[in-house]
Amino acid sequence: MAETDLNALAYKDSDSTDTSSSSSSDEEYQAEVKVSNQNEKQVDYDSDTDLNTDNKVSSVDAYKPCVGENLIIRDSNIIILLRAKEKLCLSGLFDLKIEKGGLLYNDIHFNASSKTYHYWHPLSNSIPEIKSSFYAGFEDVDISAFYAAYDISPNNDYETVLKISNHKSKSLIDGEILMPSLKSLWITKEDFLQKNGYTNFSFDIIMPATLQEITTLNISKSWTNCLQKLKFINQNSIHDTRIMVIGGKNSGKSTFLRSLVEKVLYSHDISDKSVSEMLYLDLDPGQPEFSHPDCISMTRLTSNDMNFGQSFGQASPEVLKQYYIGSPSPQEYPTRYLNMVNKLITEFEDTMFAGISCINLPGWVKGFGLNILQKVLEIYKPTDIVYLESPSTVRHFSELRIPKSFSSTMMTEYSPRSYRIPAEFSNAAINNSPEIKFAPSDIRTYKLLCLFHRSDTSNVPTFDFRPLIAKSPKKISYGRAGIHTIIINIEFALVPSHELIQALEGTIVAIYHEENTDDEHDSSSDIRVLSNDDLETAKFITLGLVHSVDEERKYFNIYVPENMVATLKNLGNRFMIERLSTETPFCELSPPNKVLKTDQTSPFISFKTRKKYEHVWKIRKNIKRKGHHL
């Protein structure tokens, strides 16, 4: 197969030619992205000239807010008016509606319409630019009523008018209550709205001072061409498209996949009213996009979701299947991880999905990580393999054994196409300010907090970040009904069950529902102890935090996500819990002092009542003995 230059196939939009990158290095980009069969030689590139290292918004076209002129502020929303080619960056959680003109976001053009888009822009990730653009629709848009409502003169030279509102999940930014180190995760006090006293918004306009401290997202030409090619192939294929992206740590895998999702779901022809969908296989338990922490999953995404950015797994897409790994790293339980991956991809094959799918993989490309990549490659059988290359990973990628052809449930025989493009380390959120630097462990802890403090019972995520010890846990019986099995590592199998139960207090466990009944165990009131290999009949439901165990009355006091309570009740009384390595957030066991002082309700400490004459220790504060006077 002859090599094909993707530049010739990429869509050329007159208003988007200068949005792929703001750096001069991309203008001088010499290496061409190549697509070929695996058995053909791949061309190399000069990594120093291709990497985009200047991820800053140009001051020439930067939006400069001025209240009363190009910015109108109301109680629950703001109106932003942009002239031609003006661009800005917004952080936080917000809903966006285009009232006039259009905008460019990640090289995707959007027209004014009645649609509302939902954005999740934490400062732990690189922030995409929002750039004004023209209206390219066929239908007339009447904006006169909108102008009248906001006292905007109809005779203005603004190309784009945006309405920005608080996100329905505004309470997600309150995570700093338990983790003060994340106080600048979504917005900072130095940006426009916060600095000028408008503190009721869940978002902010990032000012130049903050822009110098954070990373803005810029998609290079090589990435743009590759993304467009993948979309083009999917649109013109009568079979399914399976995309596997391989790269090292901070190479931009998650960013590339997020851009691919947006390209596939939201970059339609103007007249196309159909709903697009794709399947997302989340195989990175340490940095999952949609899974629970320490889990892998298969998720269905549709163009009706309208979600952009990093939602920390709170965007509420349809999770089709989920497996608990028990650790953020596949390295801790490698056999278990590979078994779960095999099960998940088997579930994917059984769906007979004829659209586009992609895989989010860990950035482990050395040693056993290569074995994982090889195994996933063999069972997923990708139609397209994207290598995010850097000088340190090219050698490891060459060790992968790519078959010349695959056969799947959807196609009898096909050869995988390969793409070698440079990794974009410049898009990694390497922030300069100590206040907006976030360790991966802090982000993992935050995801756990979001899971356990989600308080909604609908598809609109809401959060209550009061400490869990200030709330009453749920009671789940154990023994004959309720939780009838504890699953542990094989090395603890001989530990007596009553000691295991006590050891679970204060730990995070996985909660399963046993789909097949065991009549023999139904007659026993004791709880079973099984090894991790005995999970064939169990379905993972959610994570739980064990508060305490009442061995006399035989029930667990356990915290579970509020939005999962109804699901657990509907499933009946046959549950299993599994303890592995997921760590309990320390801030749940010992919340910041100011949090406990401001909490007006008594924390749930114990279910035991003292006996009538039971001694109570009382601390005397007025003791002044000789030994105390030094």
Curated annotation (Swiss-Prot):
Gene3D superfamilies for the chain? P-loop containing nucleotide triphosphate hydrolases (3.40.50.300)
- Where is the protein localized? Nucleus, Nucleolus
User: Mind telling me which InterPro entries this protein's record contains?
Assistant: Clp1/Grc3, CLP1_P, P-loop_NTPase
User: What EC number(s) does this enzyme carry?
Assistant: 2.7.1.-
According to its UniProt record, where is this protein mainly located?
Answer: nucleus
**In which domain of life is the source organism classified?**
Eukaryota
Q: Report the enzyme's class at the first EC level.
A: transferase
Kindly list the cysteine pairs connected by disulfide bridges: none
Positions annotated to bind ATP: G247, G248, K249, N250, S251, G252, K253, S254
Q: Which GO terms describe its molecular function?
A: ATP binding; polynucleotide 5'-hydroxyl-kinase activity
Q: What's a GO biological-process term for it?
A: rRNA processing
UniProt cross-references to PANTHER family, sorted A to Z: CLEAVAGE/POLYADENYLATION FACTOR IA SUBUNIT CLP1P (PTHR12755), POLYNUCLEOTIDE 5'-HYDROXYL-KINASE NOL9 (PTHR12755:SF3)
Q: What is this protein's function?
A: Polynucleotide 5'-kinase involved in rRNA processing.
Its name, as the record gives it, is Polynucleotide 5'-hydroxyl-kinase GRC3
What species is given as this protein's source? Candida glabrata (strain ATCC 2001 / BCRC 20586 / JCM 3761 / NBRC 0622 / NRRL Y-65 / CBS 138)
